[in-house]
């Protein structure tokens, strides 16, 4: 069965290829076309590329605000990916009832640097902490009542 299927597909493929070669070679080619064709094709490609590049440049200028918004979304997606990678660490810290202040001390992050550019791990844990402390189960826990970061 497999041999029959393979041979049938091979025959069909060879016949289709043979028909394509016959159709492609029906037109006679002159010596002038043979010599001039690559040059003309090159110029047409360059001209069409220039027209295409001008159109895309105009479109890019019009869509620059959309591109900036997309870049911001991509950066947010990257940061969410990093936070997803660190989720087990966040869960461990939360199970140890660590506040964001405890995490900051464990990561040896000074407070003055957090105001300028917070660590992604620390800011991810703060977000994780806020979300999980809003759950009914943890709402009244003493470590969730601390709001000092």
Curated annotation (Swiss-Prot):
UniProt keyword Iron, yes or no: no
Q: Report the superkingdom from the record.
A: Eukaryota
Give the primary localization class. Answer: secreted
* Induction of expression: Expression is up-regulated at later stages of infection.
Subcellular localization(s) per the UniProt record:
Secreted; Host cytoplasm; Host nucleus
Leader peptide range in chain numbering: 1-24
Map motif RxLR-dEER onto the chain: 52-78
- Would you tell me the Gene Ontology cellular component terms? extracellular region; host cell cytoplasm; host cell nucleus
Entry remark concerning the domains of this protein:
The RxLR-dEER motif acts to carry the protein into the host cell cytoplasm through binding to cell surface phosphatidylinositol-3-phosphate.
Q: What does this protein do?
A: Effector that acts as a broad suppressor of cell death to interrupt plant immunity. Inhibits cell death induced by cell death-inducing proteins, including the PAMP elicitor INF1 from P.infestans.
| Family recorded in the similarity comment | Belongs to the RxLR effector family.
Q: What is this protein called?
A: Secreted RxLR effector protein 17
Q: Which organism is it from?
A: Plasmopara viticola
Q: What is the lineage of its organism?
A: Eukaryota, Sar, Stramenopiles, Oomycota, Peronosporales
């Amino acid at each position: 069965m497999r041999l029959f299927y393979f041979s049938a597909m091979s025959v069909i493929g060879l016949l289709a290829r043979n028909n394509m070669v016959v159709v492609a070679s029906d037109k006679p080619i002159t010596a002038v076309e043979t010599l001039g064709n690559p040059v003309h094709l090159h110029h047409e490609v360059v001209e069409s590329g220039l027209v295409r590049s001008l159109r895309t440049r105009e479109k890019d200028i019009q869509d620059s605000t959309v591109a900036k918004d997309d870049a911001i979304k991509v950066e947010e997606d990257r940061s969410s990916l990093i936070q997803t990678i660190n989720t087990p660490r966040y869960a461990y810290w939360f199970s140890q009832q660590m506040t964001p202040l405890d995490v900051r001390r464990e990561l040896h992050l000074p407070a003055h640097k957090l105001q300028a550019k917070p660590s992604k791990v620390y800011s991810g844990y703060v977000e994780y902490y806020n979300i999980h402390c809003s759950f009914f189960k943890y709402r009244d826990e003493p470590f969730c009542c601390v709001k000092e970061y």
